[in-house]
UniProtKB/Swiss-Prot annotation:
NADP(+) binds at residues 13-18, 39-43, 60-61, 81-83, 140, 164-167. Notoamides have been shown to exhibit antitumoral activities. Notoamides A-C show moderate cytotoxicity against HeLa and L1210 cells with IC(50) values in the range of 22-52 mg/ml, but the IC(50) value of notoamide D is greater than 100 mg/ml. Moreover, notoamide C induces G2/M-cell cycle arrest at a concentration of 6.3 mg/ml. This is NmrA-like family domain-containing oxidoreductase notA'. Keywords: Alkaloid metabolism, NADP, Oxidoreductase. Its EC number is 1.-.-.-. NmrA-like family domain-containing oxidoreductase; part of the gene cluster that mediates the biosynthesis of notoamide, a fungal indole alkaloid that belongs to a family of natural products containing a characteristic bicyclo[2.2.2]diazaoctane core. The first step of notoamide biosynthesis involves coupling of L-proline and L-tryptophan by the bimodular NRPS notE', to produce cyclo-L-tryptophan-L-proline called brevianamide F. Belongs to the NmrA-type oxidoreductase family. One of its GO terms (biological process) is alkaloid metabolic process. One of its GO terms (molecular function) is oxidoreductase activity. One of its GO terms (cellular component) is nucleus. Transmembrane segments: none annotated.
């Protein structure tokens, strides 16, 4: 396909945890030109995307005129607003919806974007009749509805994110989890300490690998955006309860045996072979504390308890849509059929955590 026929997809939040994988996946498809919006074009993350072939554009989401310029000439857009931005912690500061509205208004004024994929979430206030509210989720849902009701776009596709597998890559975060997956406790276990997900028993959670699958899932939507207009796409790589996730981490052969086998044969052990356990937390308030992130986490688990683990609300927890989209994107990238499947938690731990243990 010639450069004049390539369609431009612009990514807002391009150096973030979601936007980065989207840019990297789309760049592997010659049918698309990829424009990456960032507040800091001089950052190492932005330079890395430029080295891969992305067009880097400076843009501040709070400045509408910059959004108009950044999205001008684009055929489609992926947008994720950062709910963890400390500016939203100030009750006197504009909200995440205010930011999202400026971005959407800028896209509309740019005049060329036909297809929008927005990283949204469940309207928890409506779903629970105000009984278990996650403020960040409601802000995202409100932005989604604003975009859809504008009447400007040919298609608007809302994404619901699974729980990030990627949080287990950071050793600094492990201490907040009880040590899992990097640090042993006094009993020589790598212990995960979190509240139970669900009302009375451990309910399954949808897990997503941002680096391995998320970008390809979004890529797949842009191949046939009309198929996903107004349709929630849950991004899910694997589905497991916390105890099942611990099993995935532990699976494999003991470390010494794994070391010898991998060097003497072509067999590779899966995951880590390390001892781990899950201990449900009962005193939620004491566990999470009164920090902003602690209160946000508490709200999420209260939602899980109230809904008996309905993480996506009325949307089913399934890998079906994600698997279809991943396969389509991989085919468009020219990947081998064996490299078109979603990653499992076992495979993810083996790939991303085992080398660090």
């Amino acid at each position: 396909m010639t450069n004049t026929n390539r369609r431009t997809i612009t990514v807002y939040g391009a150096t973030g945890a979601q936007g980065g994988p989207v840019v990297r996946s789309l760049l592997k498809n010659n049918a698309f030109k990829v424009r990456a919006i960032t507040r800091k074009p001089e950052s190492e993350a932005a330079k890395a995307l430029a080295d891969l072939g992305a067009e880097i554009v400076q843009g501040d989401g709070w400045k509408k005129e910059q959004m108009v310029a950044a999205f001008s000439g684009s055929w489609a857009a992926f947008v994720n607003t950062n709910s963890d931005d400390p500016c939203f912690w100030d009750a006197n500061h504009p909200t995440e919806f205010d930011l999202g509205k400026i971005i959407i208004d800028g896209i509309i004024q740019a005049g060329t974007v036909k297809h929008l994929v927005y990283s949204s979430f469940v309207d928890t206030s409506s779903f629970t009749n105000g009984q278990a509210i996650i403020e960040a989720a409601d802000e995202k849902s409100k932005i989604e509805r604003y975009a859809a009701s504008s009447g400007h776009f040919d298609t608007v596709c809302p994404l619901y994110q699974g729980w990030y597998m990627d949080v287990f890559r950071g050793q600094e975060y492990a201490h907040a989890l009880g040590g899992f997956p990097y640090f042993e406790d006094e009993d020589k276990f790598r212990t995960l300490r979190l509240p139970r997900w669900g009302t009375h028993t451990d309910m399954p959670l949808p897990w997503i690998s941002l680096e391995d699958d998320f970008g390809d899932i979004v890529h797949g939507i842009f191949l046939t955006p009309e198929d996903y207009n107004g349709r929630v796409v849950p991004t899910v790589s694997d589905i497991r309860t916390y105890p099942e996730m611990i099993d995935a981490f532990q699976s494999g052969m003991p470390s010494l045996f794994w070391f010898l086998v991998c060097r003497l044969t072509s067999v590779h052990a899966l995951a880590t072979g390390q001892k781990a356990r899950y201990i449900p937390v009962t005193d939620w308030e004491a566990h999470f504390g009164d920090s902003h992130h602690g209160k946000e986490s508490l709200a999420i688990f209260k939602f899980g308890k109230f809904t008996n683990g309905k993480y996506f609300g009325d949307e089913p927890i399934s890998t079906d849509i994600s698997a279809t989209l991943k396969a389509k994107a991989a085919e468009a990238q020219g990947k081998d059929p064996s490299d078109r499947k979603l990653i499992t938690l076992v495979e993810w731990f083996e790939k991303h955590v085992a080398p660090l243990l």
